[in-house]
Amino acid sequence: YSGVNTNSKQYKALKEKGWLEGVIQNEAMMSPEEKMIYEIFGGRDTIVNNLMKQFDSDGDLLNANGVAGMDVTGKGTSWQKLTNVSEEYRQKMFDNVKKEFIQENGVSNGDTTKRSDIFKDYQLSVNKDKRLSGTWTLEQYEGQYRSAMYVAVKAANPNWKPGQKFDTSILDNVTRELVEATLVKNGNRLVRNSIDVSV
């Protein structure tokens, strides 16, 4: 290799995962014409360097958002445990859920949500070994915040259905602190013990 650092942790991870072997196997199946074009575009060096970019400097696989420590391969469900998530990120998630609940009239819209940005920012704010369980926990809070808003709107207007407009002042009484005060741990999940969303 002329442009590949074979001592890097990225290269070693590439080799351990069998990706390098896959590159070599693909090369063996190329016709002479394909091999010529392959070499014109940089050959194995280019392919290996591009694949190495999928790992951080520690050799940990990066997810689609460029965050290491999020690979669950071979971990079963051991990462699905509750852990402490800072008030800052719980508040950011609550504010986002509330904004999007109002904006989308209670419907979860995967096209316009900013939740992935909050998760990524959170993940980058903690050590790699805390990212999976922290993300699991933040997702638990997110679901409970959304559920509390649904319950509040439904209590004020029993005929309301997600997608229909509603009086957004109903949610003035729904705060992160109120929702969290009703949550209890149930195994690896957060559930509501009880909630008072009287208007």
Model-derived features: positions:
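Type III/flagellar secretion export determinants
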Residues: Y1-V199
